[in-house]
Amino acid sequence: MNRTQPYFHSLRFIACMILLAICLKGQALATKRHSRMEITTGSVNSVVIRGDSESAVIYGGADNQLENIDWVLLAHHRRDVVWAAEDLIAQGAKVIAPAAERELIESPELFWEAFQQGRFHDYAQQSTKILGQGLKVSKWVSEGDDLDLGGVKLTALETPGFTRGSISYLTEIDGQRIVFTGDLIAGMGKILDVYSYQDAIESANIRGYHGYGGRFAALLNSIEKVKQLDPDILVPARGQIITKPRQALDKLEFRIKELYRSYLSTSALNWYFKEERMGICAEQVLGVNAKFSLMPYSAYQDTPDWIWVKGTSRLLISETGHSLLIDCGNPGVIQGVKELLKTGVINKVDGIFVTHYHDDHTDSVQAASEEFDCPVYAVQHYVDILRHPGNYHMPCLHHTPIRDVVSKQHGDVMEFHEFKLTFRAFPGQTFYHGALLVESPEQAPVFFIGDAFSPSGMDDYCVLNRNLMHKNDGFLYCLSQIKELGEDYWLINEHIPHVFRFSAKELESLERGFQTRVEAMRALTVWDDPNYAVDEQWASLYPYGLEVKSGTIHEFNVILTNHSSKRRDYDVQFRLPPGAELMSVTKAIKVPAGALSGVRAMIKLPSKPGHYLLRADIKSDGIDVRDWIESTITVKSGE
């Protein structure tokens, strides 16, 4: 649905026209020909400005039929907005784009070529909503660069945050100062998501993987820059037009800080990075001398001697000499276990349990399984990513498939000599995560929880791990399982050479802190459920990565997770690479609240060898995201 509103001579008129557009529910409004500017809201907003000598469109034409456009101005490199400009560019409009993102706009093919291997063991954690093919840009702009249309001038403002090199544009028409803010803001105190802000925090020596809100500081600086301009109107790339900029930006600043303050209060990184580095992070976002809290360390002690410690692996040793390996991230673990066999500490490795798919826990699991001739166990919901890592795009993805994985259901029990083993779904640090509860008559229960918690809190620092926020999944579900253990238990995170546990009071504090974060996320983002803001893969293409011979017909599935509290009807439209053909497809699908389902397509892939992107648009009530998801395809010669 598009709502068109002409700009005349006053802010009051614009506000009235916005209200009228809402009341008309999509009926087109008449546009007087003498107006300088026309705004059409939609999945991507479209702004047409006509000067005395030239015309320009900001963001793109969206679904409008626009003619005689000289320039199209891009706010950033991301294809989920840039698609709206493609028709105008094809018609001959010249492109203006941020110089800071030149490589991703001009030659994205280089990114995708490197990404075929770079997507494994990826610790940078940047969005891959990147163009498939480069654009010819006529003018690269940085801070202060102008475009004079004749009677109307547009000035570039560097406003990083949503992307590293985002640009906003400032103009003044009839005495009204207007800023076209890109994705800096998406509504009254709201942004589109949080995962887009994941990045390294160099001043604290924190890489992208651990950089929760890593570009929040840049965003806050950009907000302040726009506030200093004292604008009358903000026009974002997506979301509602803002006629009270100061109020909207103040709310956004407050909400970002509230979310980050909540994150710090329960962060596992306090154990690893200590107060000094966490303080640097806090100062960048919250300000100098701002108040924030870090969770004090919980109780911990040395690991008992019947659990062997090696890197991010553990070996559960029975009094019989039999053993069970927990994770295997490198060949040194295999060599260490062989020494235990050689010296008689153990007489057999009976199996391997994998807590989650991350490379530092899985890279040598297949080799260990072959070396010790033993089965590999995992909980059902992440078995496929262990077997077929190339079908996924996730942080820290291992590259070596684990061929034979025994799938266990949540709650399955296995007797292992004097130990009782209970397999658990434990979607903590990542969605694809499990845990193993080990009980014995003589010992307090030991819960192998992968990387989900440390003595200072929860490992939710990488949003792209899919840290969900529903009551019955994610960290709240993990906390409920720990609570069930009572007071006498121990937790093992294999990055920590100790066992540790939380008191009842600490568990309540963690749960309360996370619930506060859920509400902060809800207030900050535009979706009807905050999980969309932290789960980039609520929609994804499966398989994500594919290597095939030319002319292959292959099945692809768009996997949809409905985080909303209502049933959703989805429509999926594929964007095929050149030379591909859609053979069959499920056009629409109904997904109950909280459920997961998919749209299946059979696609004949190109015959010409090369790298390609298959992409898709997703539509539902209140959701219209285009060029949103991708699958990378490498076509090899059929010979």
Walk through the language-model features, giving the residues of each.
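Low-complexity, acidic Ser/Thr/Pro/Gly-rich terminal tails and inter-domain linkers that flank the onset
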Residues: 518-549
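Asparagine-centered strand-capping/turn motif at beta-strand->loop junctions
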Residues: 559-564
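Short, surface-exposed loop/turn segments at beta-strand-coil junctions that are enriched for proline
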Residues: 604-610
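Active-site HxH/HxHxD metal-binding segment of metal-dependent hydrolases
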Residues: 36, 61-146, 332-334, 340-415
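Short proline/glycine- and polar residue-rich coil/turn motifs
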Residues: 588-597, 635-636
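Metallo-beta-lactamase
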Residues: 55, 146-149, 153-246, 251, ...
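Conserved beta-strand hairpin/beta-sheet module of binuclear metal-dependent hydrolase folds
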Residues: 29-65, 168-182, 186-187, 291-342, ...
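Short acidic, flexible loop segments centered on an aromatic residue
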Residues: 565-579, 618-619
